[in-house]
From Swiss-Prot:
InterPro entries: dITP/XTP_pyrophosphatase, ITPase-like_fam, RdgB/HAM1. CDD domains: HAM1. Substrate binds at residues 10-15, 71, 151-154, 173, 178-179. Binds 1 Mg(2+) ion per subunit. Homodimer. The active site is at 70 (proton acceptor). Pyrophosphatase that catalyzes the hydrolysis of nucleoside triphosphates to their monophosphate derivatives, with a high preference for the non-canonical purine nucleotides XTP (xanthosine triphosphate), dITP (deoxyinosine triphosphate) and ITP. Seems to function as a house-cleaning enzyme that removes non-canonical purine nucleotides from the nucleotide pool, thus preventing their incorporation into DNA/RNA and avoiding chromosomal lesions. One of its GO terms (biological process) is nucleotide metabolic process. Pfam families: Ham1p_like. Signal peptide: none annotated. NCBIfam families: RdgB/HAM1 family non-canonical purine NTP pyrophosphatase. This is dITP/XTP pyrophosphatase. Keywords: Hydrolase, Magnesium, Metal-binding, Nucleotide metabolism, Nucleotide-binding.
Length: 197
């Protein structure tokens, strides 16, 4: 059986490699966007809207079925912030964003420090058919960063066993992450979706 070609709506080759690894053995050839492809503005108010914006643009540009992901951290005590703005909420590095979030949460008691990582994967076919797949990881925010693994908010995102995501091995993180949960749901439907066109 030949592999089905999918375009991942990103120019980031690291993300392309990650998705190739996550989809290894599933029968898909994953390609990224050309570095010269036009930038797409993520103007949506939800993870779903932003994932669809990116997937629609990638499918229209390439004529291929497209996969796009949007993700972030949702903090209950902050009314859902930073949400869709997680990667650009505060200018600077991941560490700058972690410091800013901890500063905003400084007076929030432990029982109100609940948060979740959210990942939404959009699949858009050249026919115009669209489907969304959502994965979440519940947790709470630590009072200080711990661990050296991961990226983004991982050093302050505490899972059920009391460790931060940054204290976990990559394989462990991938086994429970919001992204792996969304991707698992996507993989359940993707072969049939591609057949249906």
């Amino acid at each position: 059986m030949s592999q089905k070609r999918l375009v991942l709506a990103t120019k980031n080759q690291g993300k392309v490699r990650e998705f190739r690894s996550l989809l290894a053995g599933a029968g898909f050839e994953i390609v990224g966007l050309d570095p010269d492809a036009p930038e797409v503005s993520e103007t949506g108010d939800t993870f779903e809207e932003n994932a669809l914006i990116k997937a629609r643009a990638a499918s229209a540009l390439t004529g291929l079925p497209a996969l796009a992901e949007d993700s972030g951290i949702v903090v209950d005590a902050l009314g859902g912030e930073p949400g869709v703005h997680s990667a650009r909420w505060v200018p600077g590095s991941d560490e700058d964003r972690v410091r800013a979030l901890l500063a905003r949460m400084a007076e929030v008691p432990a029982e109100r420090r609940t948060a979740r990582y959210v990942s939404v994967i959009a699949v858009v076919l050249p026919s115009g058919r669209e489907e969304l797949f959502r994965g979440e990881l519940e947790g709470r925010l630590a009072e200080a960063p711990r661990g050296t693994g991961g990226f983004g908010y991982d050093p302050i995102f505490v899972v059920a066993d009391g460790r931060t995501v940054a204290e976990m091995a990559l394989e462990e993180k991938n086994g429970i992450s919001h992204r792996s949960r969304a991707l698992a749901r996507c993989l359940e439907r993707l072969p049939a979706l591609l057949e249906e066109g």
